[in-house]
Regions:
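Short, well-structured segments within or immediately adjacent to enzyme catalytic domains
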Residues: 2-176
């Protein structure tokens, strides 16, 4: 289910680029930012997933929650109830605590093997140095997800393929 959700997020992001000159939400030019965010543009999950375009692509907040992330289930259930009211232009944003995934700033739709999004359990927001944090570590990292152990994560590529991942996939010499 988590990989399926990431696949849906990947498709939503690719759909967004088709309508925006090949640009992802964080790559928009000023006029496009105004169109999608009004005066509320911030490079953050809540604003991106609260744009009308992304909401239309995703259809429900439930896609933004991973079954591997029990800690965020209640917040996501509340977000699902308020889904119709979220609007980046008015500043009514979905809470980051309702989202189990992160977006990768260096993603490039023109490069199909780049990573668009991952589960939120990366140790660093840097794919070259990050590892997958796990609930089996002691102490448990803040960004660990209850259903994923150390060296377990999931990701979606710009070509739309979503998969499970290990630490061997990440880093300067990673498989991906």
């Amino acid at each position: 289910k988590c990989v399926n959700n990431l696949s849906s997020i990947g498709k939503a992001l690719v759909g967004f680029t088709h309508d925006n000159g090949g640009r992802l939400p964080w790559q928009l030019i000023s006029s496009q930012k105004r169109d999608h965010f009004g005066a509320n543009y911030v490079e953050d999950l809540g604003p991106v997933f609260s744009t009308a375009a992304m909401k239309s692509e995703l259809q429900t907040a439930e896609i933004l929650w991973s079954p591997c992330d029990a800690e965020r289930e209640a917040a996501n259930e509340n977000a699902a109830k308020g889904w119709s009211g979220y609007n980046a232009k008015t500043g009514n944003l979905i809470s980051n605590t309702a989202i189990s995934y992160v977006l990768i700033k260096g993603a490039d739709i023109g490069r199909p093997s780049t990573i668009l999004s991952t589960t939120r359990n990366l140790t660093f927001c840097n794919l070259a140095t990050g590892k997958w944090a796990g609930a089996d570590e002691n102490p448990i990292p803040d960004h660990a997800m209850s259903g994923l152990n150390k060296s377990q994560g999931q990701l979606v590529l710009a070509d739309g393929s979503a998969m499970q991942s290990t630490d061997a996939d990440l880093g300067s010499f990673g498989k991906i």
